[in-house]
Amino acid sequence: ASDTQTHIQFENTNNIVGTIKTNGTATQFNTSSDYRLKENVSYNFDATTRLKQLKPARFNFISDSDTTLDGFIAHEVSSIVPEAVSGDKDATKTLENVILNADGSFFKQNISQADWIMHKAEGTFANDTTWVATHTMPEYQGIDQSKLVPLLIKTIQELEARIKTLEDA
């Protein structure tokens, strides 16, 4: 549409790989899918078997115990639909020159100890913060739920074909 605007464009070294666009009524989150970018295209794969291996779960996040959600556990999905999962199970990363809150949670990084002392004296950082040379923290896995949609569509098609075969028998 003529009123569509691109707000963010994601690129790799060769191509645009995604965009965030809006028009007068909607937001689009786009991943490149043009046929000219693809090879080895196959329409023959068993989506139902893969989909049946997934284990949807009900859960809440530790940080929000009042909200129950339906979803997946990333490391369980990674062996079935690896293209949908980012990160590695139990991964951590080490940060340098870190300021921690009083409860030990991450606050800010790349602050020298001298700058931290100065900022505390100026009141920029709370007195109960702590500076550490290195701090290890979890690097959490994520799931791109949109990567599951083709499996859902293909499974519906496979089940429709099975139903038709049974009805025609």
Where are these regions (language model features)?
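Trimeric beta-solenoid/beta-helix "fiber body" segments of extracellular/virion adhesins
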Residues: 1-35, 43-46, 64
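Intramolecular chaperone/auto-protease modules of tailspike-like proteins
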Residues: 32-169
